[in-house]
Curated annotation (Swiss-Prot):
Cofactor(s) annotated in UniProt: Mg(2+)
Primary subcellular site in the record, as a coarse category: cytoplasm
Transmembrane parts of this sequence: none
SUPFAM superfamilies referenced in this protein's UniProt entry, alphabetically: 4'-phosphopantetheinyl transferase
GO biological process terms held by the UniProt record: fatty acid biosynthetic process
Record keywords: Cytoplasm, Fatty acid biosynthesis, Fatty acid metabolism, Lipid biosynthesis, Lipid metabolism, Magnesium, Metal-binding, Transferase
UniProt record similarity statement: Belongs to the P-Pant transferase superfamily. AcpS family.
Reactions catalysed, as given in the entry: apo-[ACP] + CoA = holo-[ACP] + adenosine 3',5'-bisphosphate + H(+)
Record NCBIfam families: acpS (TIGR00516), pantethn_trn (TIGR00556)
Organism: Helicobacter pylori (strain HPAG1)
Keyword rRNA-binding belongs to the record: no
Subcellular localization, as worded in the UniProt entry: Cytoplasm
A GO term for molecular function: holo-[acyl-carrier-protein] synthase activity
Gene behind this protein: acpS
Identification of the protein by name: Holo-[acyl-carrier-protein] synthase
């Protein structure tokens, strides 16, 4: 399955200015906040990546999957890596997750590909 999401960087910037850490803590873990380095483009990219993951899993953000169930880190080459807890990986029958984020013209776009186990 594939999920995709696009986010306005300016919209995220306004939310960060208005709600500060309270906004970030709704969807980012402490380590993800550090990775974003207060850059609106990175914050928007991480938000888009989590939304894209929820779409790839066909559940959206809600009871079955929260923003904080989705963990983002970076590879040694600074590429985004996405994981879920073992519990969620088993629940959704996931073998692997692949992710990509891009920024252009004031937008962040993210794509997530989910490979499922064949049981």
């Amino acid at each position: 399955m594939i999920g995709i999401d696009i986010v306005s960087i300016a919209r995220v910037e306004k939310c960060v200015k208005r709600f500060k850490m309270r906004f970030l803590e709704r969807f980012l873990s402490p380590s993800e906040i550090v990775l974003c380095k207060d850059k609106s483009s990175s914050i928007a990219g991480f938000f888009a990546l989590k939304e894209a993951c929820s779409k790839a899993l066909q559940v959206g953000i809600g009871k079955e999957l929260s923003f904080l169930d989705i963990k983002i880190s970076k590879s040694p080459k600074n590429a985004p890596l996405i994981t879920l807890s073992k519990e969620k990986m088993d629940y959704f029958n996931i073998q692997s997750l692949s992710a990509s984020i891009s920024h252009d013209a004031g937008f962040a776009i993210a794509v997530v590909m989910v490979s499922s186990l064949n049981r």
